A protein has these predicted regions:
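Short Pro/Gly-enriched beta-strand edge/turn motifs at strand-loop
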Residues: 42-44, 67-77, 157-160, 181-185
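Short, electropositive alpha-helical surface patch
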Residues: 262-277
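C-terminal segment of N-terminal export signals and the immediately downstream linker at the start
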Residues: 23-64
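Metallo-beta-lactamase
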Residues: 57-59, 64, 96-97, 104-105, 146, 151-193, 197-265, ...
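Active-site metal-binding motif and surrounding structural segment of the metallo-beta-lactamase
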Residues: 95-97, 107-151, 246
């Protein structure tokens, strides 16, 4: 197995990249450390969200991180051939589970749907995208083929269309106030940061905040892809999210490890960036 340094991965990272081909094989492995899989092009342990994760396809992993809550990590090859994982969630619900972010490609979303059909009492029946980049919206066409809507803010829909990316369905009456998507999920626009449209998802039952690419993992040593970022406003937006959800027991970033404090790490990286500029 080829291992790349964390710095090399992050220097090459881009959320808007195109996905590599995803294998159709659905033979799930037993939970194991990533290193146990071997082979070229696989991410190292530090780059997936957690350990262990179950590999359900060539570029798709899942792990239960709380009762009725699953982390999914999907990977894509980006410039230089580096493999970069993206985190998302599956929230189990009695009448149909919720997918938070689709992965990079339709094939990856298809694998997540197949897995949910087999492993969850109520398969995925709805989805949300936390911003317009491909690692959040790339699987929309697969979901739509199954008559599953992917909701997003009106700004996310507009930006996806502008950048010729899969376009979600707009959430009605979405504004500055937190917006409930049922009793177990709330979404909130804290302000511009990684992108102008990034939102966070709050899971009150678990007291978990999903920050998406708006927040950086503790293993990140820079801000990653900032092509669409609003760096001057980013720190204030992070503080706004922290103030909105002060009871968060876990905060999940869009890429990398879900351990530690991504809020503090993001603020530190922003301070470092400001010092350098």
């Amino acid at each position: 197995m080829t291992h790349y340094t964390k710095r090399a991965f992050l220097a090459a990272a881009t959320c808007a990249c195109c996905a590599s081909a995803v294998g159709r094989s659905f033979a799930a492995t037993s939970p194991a450390s990533v290193g146990a899989f071997g082979g070229e092009g696989l991410p190292t342990l530090l780059e997936l969200g957690t350990d262990p994760m179950t590999r359900i396809g060539e570029t798709v992993w899942v792990a239960r991180i709380a009762p009725q809550l699953w982390l999914h990590s999907t990977t894509a090859s980006i410039q230089g051939g580096y493999v970069f994982p993206a985190n998302g969630l599956i929230v189990e619900r009695p009448k149909g589970s919720l997918l938070i972010d689709t992965g990079y490609s339709p094939d990856q979303s298809e694998l997540l749907l197949q897995w949910s059909n087999i492993n969850l009492a109520a398969p995925i029946s709805s989805a949300i995208a936390t911003h317009f980049h491909r690692d959040r919206t790339g699987g929309i066409d697969s979901l739509r083929a199954h008559r599953i809507r992917t909701l997003a803010s009106p700004l996310t829909c507009a930006l996806a269309k502008e950048h010729d990316l899969p376009v979600p369905d707009p959430i009605r009456n979405f504004g500055e106030a937190p917006h409930r998507l049922g009793p177990d999920c709330e979404i909130f626009f804290p302000g511009a940061g990684h992108t102008r449209d990034n939102i966070v998802a709050w899971l009150p039952k678990h007291q978990i905040l999903f920050g998406g690419c708006f927040l950086k993992s503790v293993t990140s040593d820079d801000l990653g892809n900032v092509a669409d970022a609003d760096i001057p406003d980013w720190a204030a937006s992070v503080r706004r999210a922290r103030a909105q959800y002060p009871l968060a027991k876990m905060t999940i970033p869009g890429h990398g490890s879900i351990a530690g404090d991504p809020v503090a790490q993001t603020l530190a990286l922003l301070a470092k960036s400001n010092e350098q500029n």
